[in-house]
Amino acid sequence: MPTERKEDLHQQLKEIEKWEKDQQKVWFWEKLSRLPFQLLDKLTPEFIQKKIGKLLDEVGSFVQTGGQYLTSEKQIIRMFQKKLPEEIFESLEDIRKAPLPVMDEIAEGMGKNRTNAATVQGATTGVGGVFTLAADIPAVLGLSLKTLQDIAVAYGYDPKEKKERVFIVKCLQLTSADVVGKRSILQELKHYDQDRTYKNVASQIQGWREVVLGYRDTFGWKKLFQIVPVAGMVFGAAANRSTLNDITETGMMLYKKRRILERLKETEREME
């Protein structure tokens, strides 16, 4: 399979590093969206609070075993085979050798499919206002975890490994973190494929609570509008689409960065 030139890999790495710097800026919408969370806690009925408690357990279960959220690796392998019929794709090992533009295209396509599903979910649950909001948050969390796993596979990483599931949860955290949190997470993930770094990150994800509450907070401002029955349909669809778009972008950038760094290492080894 044709591989990228070293210069091209460095150029793409620069673009990802620029994106990482942009993540560490405070945008107006982020300032605005973090205002009403104390208010949201007061407005959130007890049955939704219990639902959030259940989500904490589910995220913990996902990291330990993959739980109900594991994705279909075979389906993604078939996509690569269709894109590159002259090559043979039977496993993740084969995907790892695929050209980066093909990885990008498949990862983006998987993200769009999940985003469309989340948009429909948001519109449907928005009709009933606060009572169906309880069903929406876990559904979108599930779609987010599946999206990140699809992207992991598209770049040749195996979400059946605990190391990758920890990375996926960190991607989820990055999407919903404030600017200080984003800076900290990006620093943690800088050399993720070194064993010591992975173990440090794994030990830091002790409080699943911060993951899910951060995720809930991202929904906060957007979802306040969804509490109004019927009108919430429009806001629910828009909020879910925005969330899954962010998840897809984050997953693609961080997984692509790892794949580029791996390829640069391989290039250096070949030159020795």
Swiss-Prot record:
State the source organism's domain of life: Bacteria
Question: Which InterPro entries does the record associate with it?
Answer: EcsC
The record's PANTHER family line, in alphabetical order, gives: PROTEIN ECSC
* Protein's UniProt name: Uncharacterized protein YdbA
- Which species is listed as the source? Bacillus subtilis (strain 168)
Q: What is the lineage of its organism?
A: Bacteria, Bacillati, Bacillota, Bacilli, Bacillales
